[in-house]
């Protein structure tokens, strides 16, 4: 004969409830706890002054255009190198990097001519194209009226800058751009649009803006076409805009 056991039903139910709650709490904590990082951040030299970070790819060092070619035919870039800067030589053509990139941090310094000529889009005009397709406008926008999404720092014909942070003509200016390329699915299906964050002279002017598509000259919705990595392009718009200290970090 088996011995008889006496159970206190309320106590048993309470004990089981506590056990279940404990298990639920442990499961919840496991599901919501921030995972501990496994990899120690890489140590780099951030550089000082105009010196690029140690993990950057220098695209223009103030001496040579060896990293640049003409968009038209791939021949060597014909812009002028003077006083540590490359200068647009009107009519020689838009140039691009030999290398191609995806997600990047881009630093570039530029200056429009000190002598003001023209107005609107005819004054110190150039452009920086990410992956050869998506333009951040370069323009003398200091006391220079033009359409809003054509100002310096605009994602051209898509987004005006949040503020106009332009310096006087002839003064050096900086763009720091965080660019994430679009992600495509089957065919030309866009799973995620390209995004840009832009700082102009240290001031935020584009805040994780979703790019509608490749730059067009008309204010119409552009259409994405599936692509891979692409070059950085600097535009010859006929004005002697200067560029220097150009580098990227691949993200």
Located regions from the model:
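N-terminal secretory signal peptides that target proteins for export/translocation
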Residues: 1-7
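Carbohydrate-interacting regions of secretory-pathway proteins
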Residues: 26-251
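Bacterial N-terminal signal peptides
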Residues: 13-24
């Amino acid at each position: 004969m088996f011995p008889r056991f006496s159970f206190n039903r309320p106590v048993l139910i309470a004990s089981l409830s506590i056990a279940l709650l404990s298990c639920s709490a442990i499961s919840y904590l496991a599901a919501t706890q921030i995972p501990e990082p496994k990899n120690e951040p890489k140590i780099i030299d951030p550089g000082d002054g105009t010196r690029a970070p140690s993990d950057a790819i220098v695209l223009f060092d103030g001496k040579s255009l060896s990293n640049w070619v003409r968009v038209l035919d791939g021949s060597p870039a014909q812009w002028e190198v003077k006083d540590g800067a490359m200068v647009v030589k009107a009519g020689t053509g838009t140039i691009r990097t030999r290398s191609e990139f995806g997600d990047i941090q881009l630093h570039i310094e530029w200056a429009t001519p000190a002598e003001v000529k023209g107005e609107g889009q005819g004054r110190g005009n150039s452009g920086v194209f990410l992956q050869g397709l998506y333009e951040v406008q370069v323009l003398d926008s200091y006391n220079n009226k033009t359409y809003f999404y054509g100002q310096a720092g605009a994602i051209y014909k898509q987004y005006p800058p949040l503020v106009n942070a332009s310096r006087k003509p002839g003064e050096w200016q900086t763009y720091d751009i965080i660019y994430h390329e679009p992600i495509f699915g089957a065919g030309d299906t866009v799973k995620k649009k390209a995004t840009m964050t832009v700082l102009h002279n240290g001031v935020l002017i584009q805040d994780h803006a979703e790019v509608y598509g490749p730059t067009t000259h008309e204010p119409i919705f552009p259409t994405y076409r599936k692509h891979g990595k692409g070059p950085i392009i600097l535009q010859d718009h006929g004005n002697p805009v200067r560029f220097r200290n150009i580098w990227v970090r691949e993200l």
